[in-house]
């Protein structure tokens, strides 16, 4: 799969690649808004592929949602509001709540009429992929982002040590559904405390793009030294 970041510059590339029959991993998704644009880009690309008589059944794509980084960032902001009892109660809950809202959007989009028409012509859903699912805060369960992110038609690129821990003491049970009322309540509570989830996600995206650019530059430099 070609890996393309979920940025304003990336959405057009995603559609174009899919229209040309190329599998795509849309990465660095943090916010619900990014996910919506990602799914739209997928549908647009598949529509163009089908219009050109392409083979929709050969296409696979995932929407990679980064999880634990959101809790790391949100928890730091919540720690600054320690005098407010509600702040402490929200720690460690923001990332999964955000993921639940994204999954709800996924179920709505891919159960809709637009995709169902494509599905009859061989198209597969663009699966949601949970990334960055290793637990970074030792105060949380070592399998937190596995047990709390089990949902139909999703993928979890779990670190090996987390997988081993889950095999040791985890339970396979669906924990995310299309019902996201509780998740919405958590995000609303965060907003009431003056923390904007969209701003948090925007900063994480910016940081992620910079890290990707640095990795790419390092790769090019390494290749140049070999030639």
Q: Where do the model's predicted regions map?
A:
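Active-site beta->alpha loop and helix N-cap motifs at the rims of alpha/beta catalytic domains
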Residues: 1-12
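Short secondary-structure capping/turn micro-motifs that flank functional sites
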Residues: 10, 32-34, 206-207, 220
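Catalytic alpha/beta core domains of metabolic enzymes, predominantly
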Residues: 14, 22-161
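Flexible, acidic glycine-rich loops studded with aromatic residues
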Residues: 122-226
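Long, hydrophobic, amphipathic alpha-helical segments used as structural scaffolds
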Residues: 1, 114-117, 220-223, 227
């Amino acid at each position: 799969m070609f890996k393309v970041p979920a940025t304003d510059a990336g959405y057009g590339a995603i559609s174009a690649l899919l229209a040309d029959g190329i599998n795509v991993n849309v990465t660095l998704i943090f916010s619900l808004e990014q996910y919506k644009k990602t799914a739209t880009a997928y549908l647009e690309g598949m529509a163009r592929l089908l219009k050109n008589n392409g083979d929709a059944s050969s296409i696979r794509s995932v929407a990679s949602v980064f999880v634990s980084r959101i809790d790391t960032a949100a928890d730091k902001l919540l720690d600054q509001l320690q005098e407010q009892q509600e702040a402490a109660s929200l720690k460690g809950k923001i990332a999964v709540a955000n993921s639940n809202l994204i999954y709800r959007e996924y179920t709505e989009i891919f159960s809709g009429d637009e995709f169902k028409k494509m599905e009859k012509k061989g198209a597969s859903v663009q699966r949601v992929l949970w990334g960055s699912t290793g637990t970074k805060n030792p105060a949380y369960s070592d399998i937190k982002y596995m047990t709390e992110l089990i949902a139909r038609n999703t993928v979890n690129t779990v670190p090996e040590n987390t997988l081993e821990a889950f095999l040791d003491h985890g339970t396979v049970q669906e924990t995310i559904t299309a019902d996201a009322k509780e998740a919405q309540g958590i995000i609303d509570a965060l907003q009431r405390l003056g923390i904007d989830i969209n701003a948090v996600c925007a900063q994480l995206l910016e940081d992620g793009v910079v890290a990707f650019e640095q990795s790419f530059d390092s790769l090019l430099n390494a290749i140049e030294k070999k030639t």
